[in-house]
Amino acid sequence: GLERVVNALRVIAPELPFEIHFREIQGAQQVFEMDGYRLIAYRVNHNVLCYGYSIEIDRAGKFDAVRAKEQEIPLKYWSRLQKGEQIEENGTCYTPDMVLGAPRKGIKLTYCTDTRPTQSLVENAMHADLLICEGMYGEPGKEEKAVEHKHMTFTEAAEVARKAQVSEMWLTHYSPSLNRPEEYMKTVTDIFPNAYPGKDGKTTELMFEGEAKEAS
């Protein structure tokens, strides 16, 4: 598996400035929880085994100072409760749900290349803030080639974005013969307006609702 491949490569680079933790995917879908992030790996439809990925960051409810005061929760515990900690003091237990409102909308990024349109992709991309999706073929008349090689056309990617109700989509993973993907974006935006051609070095910031966003 992956661990064997990476360890073989480390023969030529034995010293790394970071640790590697191997978590290999088992089955059609698997969820990994790590450091406040949720990574969902799901199988897609290509000529070889491939997975798409969604990264989710949850956002807790807003801290309610009025409720905290009404329940006489010591001020020194407010920040810890806001971070999700449970606190016990002299037989009294303070829990985050005592001072937090309903969970707020978090952040979701979905990334997928090397696949035909699949229901698993639509379901796992649902309501993503950003979908980075393969668009191998932009030119008309490439539908049969897309089916043969198990890739997507621009319009098929646009349909995925529309069905998944994502906020924004970037196309990527173009055919080497596609020199100017922007020339074919009209066929995409007719289906899903908030779509853009991805390019090397393109960046953005995904922010929680109510926070400013910058893109380049």
Language model feature labels by segment:
Residues 1, 45, 137-138:
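Short "lid" loop at the C-terminus of a central beta-strand within the Rossmann-like core
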Residues 1-24:
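Active-site HxH/HxHxD metal-binding segment of metal-dependent hydrolases
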Residues 7-10, 33, 185-189:
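Class I S-adenosyl-L-methionine
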Residues 15-17, 34, 104, 164, ...:
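Short, well-ordered coil/turn elements that cap or connect secondary structure elements
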Residues 19-21, 38, 194-196:
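Conserved beta-strand segments of alpha/beta enzyme cores
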Residues 25-29, 117-216:
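Binuclear metal-ion centers of metallo-dependent hydrolases, dominated by the metallo-beta-lactamase
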Residues 30-36:
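Short coil-to-beta-strand transition motifs
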Residues 37-111, 115-124, 130-132:
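Active-site-proximal loop/helix segment associated with metal-binding centers of metalloenzymes
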